[in-house]
Amino acid sequence: MQKLTILGATGSIGASTLKVIEQNPDKFSVVALAADSNVEKMQQLCQRWQPEYAVMANKEAALRLKMALAVLAPNTQVLGGQEALCYVATLEQVDSVMAAIVGAAGLVPTMAAVKAGKRILLANKEALVMSGQLFIDEVEKSGAQLLPVDSEHNAIFQCLPQTVQGNLGRCDLASQGVSHILLTGSGGPFRYTDVAELEAVTPEQAIAHPNWSMGPKISVDSATMMNKGLEYIEAKWLFNASRDQLKVIIHPQSVIHSMVQYLDGSVLAQMGEPDMATPIALTLSYPERVKAGVKPLDFTQVGELTFLQPDFERYPCLALAIEACYLGQHATTTLNAANEVAVAAFLARQIKFTDIARVNDSVLNQVCKQSLASGLDSLESLLELDRMARTLADEVVRERAQ
């Protein structure tokens, strides 16, 4: 029986994880559930799963949850704050940690789980975007096992040899006969929209993803293709890939979740319904496979599969992310912070959809001019840079909102 802590239990990844566990009650059990501030949802989950621990990052939310669970789940211990997140991520009885807290907030508890040598089911892409080398070094030092949950990285993982699967972050792709990793993305809801019309896009339009069911932030990132940009950075670290080895391809149907091209001309592709339960099930059970509650792909209903080159005029955020990836850690940490602020401002109707890329570009330029590439050798220094970039982004948002 594998024992789990789920960081980000009230989000879409948390829901899919619990769906897989429900399919396999003899294989997995939930020790701790953690979330940010959604008390109502957490209350329902604690009633259903009766975990040993329930943690809210927001301490006020934790107090409200504690009162609600006094009768509904009296055996569940309720804790609050970031220290509590780290505590349940490192519990001795926990084997695996689902790291699914969105954004920079997930970095510290995920890193705590890594240092504790846990099996890390990595859904929080910001952990690698913000702290790439530091994160990979800690994984190696602690002996933690790293398994990618993101559908694209999970697809790539499945298409790679076992020697690479067991050596993420340190592998040599060329020595394994790999020529290219082909990272696919749907292109979001605006792949055929006239570029001139993107300025008028509303939050409601941006979060209506054609294929996947996701939270609002990641849906906007998918519309700008910043999501693919962050995944590009993540893939660089996970698979130790060079710029020449990593390519982005738009695949509107989201049937192929990514591919690996080999030196002999072979291409291995992982295909399936666009349902996060599939990659989650694999990371939970690896190297075995278990039921995920996902219907099998019906090839007679798939129709045509199409592939396009990304248009960087339509997707400036993708271009920025690829550029930042090779500028260094200071650039990717900055871009991630600026983007979180910009997307939140867009969702709050403070800036236009096309301003997201402008905010990101402005903050990235400001930070890169300050020569901050050196000295980012600790989690604290990265978090300080993250704070600085957010402050700069807030200023740019205020300017654009006037």
Swiss-Prot record:
GO annotation, biological process: isopentenyl diphosphate biosynthetic process, methylerythritol 4-phosphate pathway involved in terpenoid biosynthetic process
Gene3D superfamilies, A to Z: 1.10.1740.10, NAD(P)-binding Rossmann-like Domain
Q: Per its UniProt entry, which superkingdom is the organism in? A: Bacteria
Residues the record lists as binding 1-deoxy-D-xylulose 5-phosphate: K125, S151, E152, S186, H209, S222, N227, K228, E231
Residues bound to NADPH are T10, G11, S12, I13, N38, N124, E126, G215
Q: Which UniProt keywords apply?
A: Isoprene biosynthesis, Manganese, Metal-binding, NADP, Oxidoreductase
Q: Which cofactor does it need?
A: Mg(2+); Mn(2+)
Q: What does this protein do?
A: Catalyzes the NADPH-dependent rearrangement and reduction of 1-deoxy-D-xylulose-5-phosphate (DXP) to 2-C-methyl-D-erythritol 4-phosphate (MEP).
Query: Could you identify this protein by its name?
Result: 1-deoxy-D-xylulose 5-phosphate reductoisomerase
Lineage at the top is: Bacteria, Pseudomonadati, Pseudomonadota, Gammaproteobacteria, Vibrionales
Gene (UniProt): dxr
